[in-house]
Amino acid sequence: MDKLENWNYGSAPSFPYGDETTYRKAIAFLDGPWTIEDWGCGTAWAKRFVERGQYVGVDGSWSLHCDVVADLRTYRSDAGGILIRHILEHNNDWRRILENALESFRQRFVLVIFTPFGDVTRSIGSTKERVPDLSFRKEDLLDFLRPFHFTEESLQTATQYGVEHLLYVT
């Protein structure tokens, strides 16, 4: 089964994945007079927090919440802001997705990771659909961000692993 088929929301109502704190923080940073793409938008919960920008939901599965159906491993765009929240952790091809996002954003980018950092990037669990939960060696992610200006924040949140890491990139 293709990973893109694992989360098919169709006409399901919008709902958040875990604590909405990081949706709010990410959109507060991204919101500006430009397009904000939410890569792996799911049910587009982040959209409700956009006040200034034009929200575009990008996902691998069609739903009423998705504006663009795309495989993030090959997708590139030209967006003022990009949000990737709780996506890289489920993708063994996370490097390709991160590279594409870094090539595509023009103003701001936020990466939100919900798994704890570890000594090595590896799977620490999986969903019932056998999609991995990757824990990252922090340096593996930061190596991609070093050419940019970025700040980071870690929060204890009501999510599966009790933590979320936000990387704010300009």
Predicted regions and their residues:
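Conserved N-terminal segment of class I S-adenosyl-L-methionine
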Residues: 1-78, 134, 161-166
